[in-house]
Amino acid sequence: MLSRFEHFTYDINEIDLHWHRIASAGMKRYGLRGGTSIYLTKLSAAPDGMSASELSAACGRDKADVSRDLRQLERAGLISRGKGYRACVTLTEQGKALAEQIIRKAEYAVGFVGGSLTEEEREVFYSVLDRITENMRRLSEIGLD
């Protein structure tokens, strides 16, 4: 029988694995990882653009990872940006079109995987997930020692 730790870890890892497979399928033709799709969707909600630092904070990603991924998105013609870390990053027309596709597919995916839940179950699920996320964040800051 699985312990709660094993059950939790296994399920979270499996969800993450499948989500990345789904996201990667749409990004392969651009030679990009599925994880870069979050930057496109965040930027689509910021028509005036964001700095790499703001994008890092908004996506909960490491600044070095964001910088590397932005270079790839720029090479793919999906974003434009000025020089320097504080420069504004915006979507190109091609980036906007791809972001819209990603958002539509993500909405479909979330609807599909949560389609068997009632609205009450969905509300409870997200409430509990938010609390677990916050508790994990706090625990990672204070550590186990």
Predicted features along the sequence, with ranges:
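N-terminal leader segment of winged-helix/HTH proteins
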Residues: M1-Y30, A76-L78, C88
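C-terminal regulatory/oligomerization modules of transcriptional regulators
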Residues: M1, E120-D145
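Charged, amphipathic alpha-helical coiled-coil/dimerization segments
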Residues: R71-D130
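Short capping segments at the starts of secondary-structure elements
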Residues: A46-S51
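Short alpha-helical "packing" element that flanks the helix-turn-helix/winged-helix DNA-binding module
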Residues: T36-L40
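A short acidic, leucine-rich amphipathic alpha-helix
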Residues: E54-S56
